[in-house]
Regions:
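N-terminal secretory signal peptides
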Residues: 1-23
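N-terminal twin-arginine translocation
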Residues: 20-30, 37-49
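N-terminal cap/lid segment of alpha/beta-hydrolase-fold proteins
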Residues: 44-74
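Short beta-strand element of the alpha/beta-hydrolase
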Residues: 76-84
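Short amphipathic alpha-helix adjacent to the substrate-entry channel of hydrolases
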Residues: 90-109, 113-114
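Gly/Ser-rich "nucleophile elbow"/oxyanion-hole loop immediately N-terminal to the catalytic nucleophile
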Residues: 125-173
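Gly/Ala-rich beta-loop-alpha elbow adjacent to hydrolase catalytic centers
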Residues: 176-180, 184
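The feature captures the conserved acid-bearing segment of alpha/beta-hydrolase catalytic domains
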Residues: 205-228
Length: 228
């Protein structure tokens, strides 16, 4: 629990530190701790016009509600985004949109679809709140298994490969935050012929003393990685 809380705080701090450099103290205090933080970020230079929709991805365990966004014209490399412990929410939709503006077809997933539809947390709620933790931790435990992650990864890759906006001649990238970090590694190992790049930010549990530690999957991957 402590590790997940730290990761969640790091994700918010990254956005906050960027914002501090762009706004006055009064403006920053008004927007801090809100999805509005992400909305203040400037558009990507030369940003593509994009289109985004809520989609449902069929998996062996049900239907995963996700957000799919991509440039309005043409075919582009696919990207899977795994959110942190607070799940798919407006801030991650905006992050996915910014990535799509750079020329990618982005699927931002609800990792907790087995338990609840997104969003699973109200804007402004903190993981440090015991009531919020009590609500989210069962979702996390239902998701954070190697077998479950592999099942979902294969379903999400298959979804992307079936989209007209995805260039299937190019490999897929995947990125994850906090609890999404280990899922990125498992995704790369589960479909090494399709995953060509991975990035984890504030990833928790990338290396453990368990026999299924994500780092032990490295020999099974064929992807370039950024671990930050």
């Amino acid at each position: 629990r402590e590790l997940l809380s730290m990761c969640d705080e790091d994700t918010e701090r990254d956005a906050a530190e960027y914002l501090k450099s762009k706004l006055s103290r009064r403006e920053f205090n008004t927007l801090a701790a809100s999805a509005a933080v992400m909305m203040t970020l400037p558009r990507v230079v030369g940003a593509a016009e994009v289109t985004g929709n809520d989609v449902n991805v069929t998996t062996p365990d049900g239907s995963a509600d996700c957000f799919f966004v991509h440039p309005a014209q043409g075919k582009y490399p696919g990207v899977i985004v795994w959110p942190d412990i607070r799940g798919l929410r407006p801030a991650f939709r905006m992050m996915a949109t910014r990535l799509a503006e750079s020329g990618y077809a982005v699927l931002c997933v609800n990792p907790f679809y087995r338990s609840a539809k997104a969003p699973v947390i109200a804007e402004g709620e903190s993981f440090n709140n015991p009531e919020v933790r009590a609500r989210l931790m069962p979702y996390y435990h239902a998701t954070a298994t190697a077998a479950t992650n592999r099942v979902d990864a294969k379903a999400f890759v298959a979804f992307l490969d079936a989209q007209r906006s995805v260039d299937v001649t190019r490999k897929i990238g995947t990125t994850g935050y906090c609890m999404g970090g280990p899922i990125v590694l498992r995704t790369a190992a589960a479909i090494p012929d399709r995953i060509g790049a991975g990035a984890t930010f504030h990833g928790g549990g990338l290396v453990t003393d368990q026999p299924d530690s994500p780092h032990l999957l490295i020999p099974e991957m064929d992807a370039a990685f950024l671990i930050a």
